[in-house]
Amino acid sequence: GSEMCIRDSIGALLSLLLLYLSGRARVTVMSRDDLQQVTSARYLGALPAVRVKKRSRTTSAALSEAMAHSSAYCEAMRIISMRIDKAMQRHDYRTMLVSSAAPGEGKTTFVCQLADALTRQGRRVLVIDCDLRNPSVHKVFGRPLQAGLAEYLAGSGMAGQIVTALGKGKPDVVFAGRRTGTQTEQLGGDAFRTLLDALRARYDVILLDTPPCAIMTDALETGEAADCALLVVRQDAASRVSVINSLAALDSFGVPVLGYALNVCTGRGRGQSGYGYGGYGGYSYGYGYGYGRDRGYGYGQQKEKTGAD
């Protein structure tokens, strides 16, 4: 009887320990303090959550437009972009990989807004959509999906032919292309490196929008061709453990990590609601990203409809 009691007690303690460790693993990043204690990666700034008017369609382009008209967002992005630009110039970097630890952190919109901010500062900027499994850059810029990186990697396009000019005062873009999902293994190959080498002379900054590096190897393979990397961390989304693992993975591939930026920040913390990323009318911006075992795999509660990552 006593041995059974001891076994039951040990089993109960182990269960409590597993629950504790599981809870610790799920603790999400709420502020810079959560990461400063566990990583030496540089904090580059925080972007506020942006609301979309109730009657507006909550699409990637609508959210991007709302950000462009938010003075608080624009000022925060201006500061972040200046820090990034200064660091890249100091190290003579031209190409920067931008990723996130998990799906749904607003990475793609961050890339496009950063590109706009750097362009306003007089830099020649190119955005390349390297997320061939789930391309989203064209959605943020409100453009149809057209020939781009996938076609180039398949050998059916020249470097100059796949660049789309969005107009005066806007960055240029290489969209993912129509043959998405078929050329991902070539992102770490010679063809992609040749493309970047051909484009470096034409641009001051080349931003590579990649899949979340915690769940896809595409980002890490792309990183081998990049000069540096930046991680977008959505407040109260990815766990601290996944963020730390993503930073470590980038470092293990020899990609200098420029730092991280907090995204979609509010003062409300857990249980936040409202418009913008967090979901008016059942929209959950970036949630339900197409990775994982099935559609709807993601890190938010709402999964009815999705936007770009």
Give residue spans per PLM region.
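Conserved inter-motif catalytic segment of the P-loop NTP-binding fold
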Residues: G155-G181
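Short, small-residue-biased leader/transition segments that mark boundaries at the very start
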Residues: G1-I6
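Switch II (G3) loop of P-loop NTPases
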Residues: E151, V174-D218
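Well-ordered beta-strand positions
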Residues: V205, C228-L231, G259
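Short boundary/hinge segments that flank catalytic cores
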Residues: D8-R124, C130-A150, S156, G160-Q161, ...
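Residue-level preference for the first positions of well-ordered beta-strands
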Residues: T95-L97, L126, P171-V173, V205-L207
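Cytosolic nucleotide-binding catalytic cores of signal-transduction proteins
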Residues: R123, L145, I215-T217, E224
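Inter-motif core of Ras-like GTPase G domains
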Residues: D218-D236
